[in-house]
Design a protein with these regions (language model features):
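Active-site-adjacent structural elements that line small-molecule/cofactor binding pockets in enzymes
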Residues: 1-317
Length: 317
């Protein structure tokens, strides 16, 4: 099993706090550090700082040394595909080839409205996702002069300068996430290096992985060439007493302090890695049995660096 830390900087993190978290993950031995790509502050206080994903990833490219970095996921509604391809290639070069990129159709309508970004219906957002995937792949892998004629974007005589090298890879490690429905499964099979199933039980993750495998077979791709991962909420502690303290802090941050603690825990126990190390290890084993090869540990206590160190010890076995 491989492990990455997934963070939610829209919870009000400054760049300095994000860097502390990334360096803690690097010191803990986790293989990758991902951040969300949002423009509004949630959950928690609505007026906290919300840093730009790719601006901060450029900073992390220079301020970390070994850990892989990336977005999970960047909505295609936020950026023009050609410009996005160049941003990713630039940050990858800055990092020495450590960038991974997750792409998605976008879902948070209020964020779009607040910044004047169009938020089309779901079908059109998926159309734009598919065109974006075709364009960024083309810019990263096709020779100069390549063109693309889509409904939403057209390119002619395309070239990317500097040319993308990605440390000898044809393109950066590309992740698509979701529930693995038929259209998404087809896009994973066509374009992605990794499929990420978010917030699911092991049984539901296994079902989604099966749909991706069938989509790969349908186009003649080896299903084993797709990394299978899961994004899983995490809340762990060395002792039950410490765990309850972290539960209290998290509930207070989310404004759920008045909710029943037992009910709060019960609602998450079948989807999260939660508890003391023994309980957490059992959950990891259940995910592995479902076919998960990499876990994105979704951290909702981003200022608790001691928990990150504990996650590193769990990852090391």
């Amino acid at each position: 099993m491989r492990f990455a830390l997934m963070t939610e900087p829209q919870q009000g993190l400054t760049y300095a706090e994000l860097l502390d978290l990334a360096r803690a993950a690097e010191s803990a031995g986790l293989e990758a550090f991902f951040r969300s790509d949002h423009s509004g502050s949630f959950a928690g206080p609505p007026d906290g700082p919300t840093t730009d994903a790719w601006a901060t990833l450029a900073g992390l490219a220079r301020d970390t040394t070994t850990i892989r970095i990336g977005s999970l996921v960047s909505p295609v509604t936020y950026r023009i595909p050609g410009s996005f391809a160049k941003v990713v290639a630039t940050v990858d070069e800055m990092s020495g080839g450590r960038v991974e990129v997750g792409l998605g159709a976008g879902w948070n309508e209020p964020e779009h409205r607040q910044l004047g970004i169009p938020f089309p219906p779901l079908r059109e957002r998926y159309d734009r996702l598919e065109e974006t995937l075709a364009i960024v792949h083309g810019l990263w892998t096709e020779p100069d002069g390549w063109g693309y004629d889509g409904e939403h974007w057209q390119l002619s005589d395309a070239h990317l300068r500097p040319p993308a090298t990605f440390s000898g890879r044809r393109h950066p490690h590309l992740i698509l996430g979701g529930d693995g429905g038929p259209r998404l499964a087809r896009l994973v099979a066509t374009y992605a290096d990794e499929f990420n199933r978010g917030s699911a039980t092991p049984a539901r993750a296994r079902e989604a992985f099966g749909r991706v495998a069938e989509a790969c077979k349908a186009i003649g791709r080896d299903p084993e060439s797709v990394v299978l991962s899961a994004m899983v909420g995490v809340l762990v502690a060395e002792t039950e007493a410490e765990l309850l303290d972290r539960v209290r802090l998290q509930r207070e941050f989310f404004g759920e302090g008045g909710a029943d603690a037992d009910a709060w825990l019960a609602e998450r126990r079948d989807r999260w890695i939660m508890g003391t190390p023994d309980a957490a290890q059992a959950r990891i084993e259940a995910l592995a049995a479902a076919g998960v090869q990499r876990i994105m540990l979704q951290d909702f206590l981003p200022r608790d660096l001691e928990m990150v160190a504990l996650l590193g010890r769990l990852a090391a076995g």
